[in-house]
Design a protein with these regions (language model features):
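N-terminal, well-ordered alpha-helical segments
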Residues: 36, 40-43, 71-75, 79, ...
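Short glycine-aspartate micro-motif
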Residues: 9-11, 52-58, 66, 97-100
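Alpha-helical context
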Residues: 31-35, 53, 67-70, 154
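Phosphate-handling active-site elements
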Residues: 47-50, 78-88
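DPxDG-like acidic metal-binding loop motif
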Residues: 54-83
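Phosphate/pyrophosphate-binding loops at sites that engage ATP/ADP/AMP, CoA/4′-phosphopantetheine
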Residues: 42-54, 121-123
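Oxyanion-binding and handling regions
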Residues: 1-26, 30, 36, 40, ...
Length: 187
């Protein structure tokens, strides 16, 4: 983020099975992992919503519905508070290894896109994320190590804020959908 970036940033990501929310003010970060509804988590880290200067939202890849909920929440808050929004890939919210996110249907999201776990070249790599946990046996059989620290498997919204794109209108933040939603419109 540049020197002209806002001072108090609400950052959140809901794209994985382990969502997270943070209020970033200077070097101080207050964050929590998913334990309740998104707005409850936001209430946990933000004392006064009027102090939010900007919002950073995880854009995926991940659950189609969860990404839509996160973007709708960012939009509602941005409009109500009249603050700018930036997006960042959920994959940037992990540290300590290569992120692998559970894509359901026997697939994972990674830097390479969407694939079956056994198709990833993971030999000698340290993996993090809910996909790494779900497919631990597959990845370890392929020569990877799945991080033992549970904190490495949840997105860190502080990292998300560090990798955010330019701040602007929420309409300029695009979701990163790598496949169509599971739900289909009825005929």
């Amino acid at each position: 983020m540049s020197a002209s970036s806002p001072q108090t940033i609400l950052a959140f990501d809901c794209a994985t099975s382990i969502g997270a929310v943070a209020a970033v003010t200077g070097g101080d970060v207050r964050w929590t992992a998913r334990a309740a509804a998104l707005m409850d988590l936001i209430d946990d880290v933000v004392d006064d919503p009027r102090r939010i200067d900007a919002i950073v939202v995880g854009t995926g890849p991940g659950s189609f519905t969860s990404i839509r909920i996160a973007l709708a929440t960012a939009r509602g808050l941005a409009l109500a508070l009249d603050v700018p929004v930036a997006g960042a890939s959920t994959l940037t919210a992990f540290s300590g290894g290569e992120p692998v996110i559970d894509a359901k249907r026997g697939e994972v999201f990674s830097e390479g896109g969407i694939s079956r776990p056994e198709e990833l070249d993971v030999a000698g790599k340290l993996l993090v994320g809910d996909g790494a946990l779900r497919y631990r046996a597959v990845f370890e059989a392929a020569g990877a190590t799945v991080a033992s620290d549970p904190d490495l498997h949840r997105p860190n919204p502080h990292l998300l804020a560090q990798h955010a794109g330019p701040f602007g209108s929420v309409e300029d933040v695009d979701p990163l959908y790598l496949r169509q939603p599971d739900a289909k419109p009825s005929a």
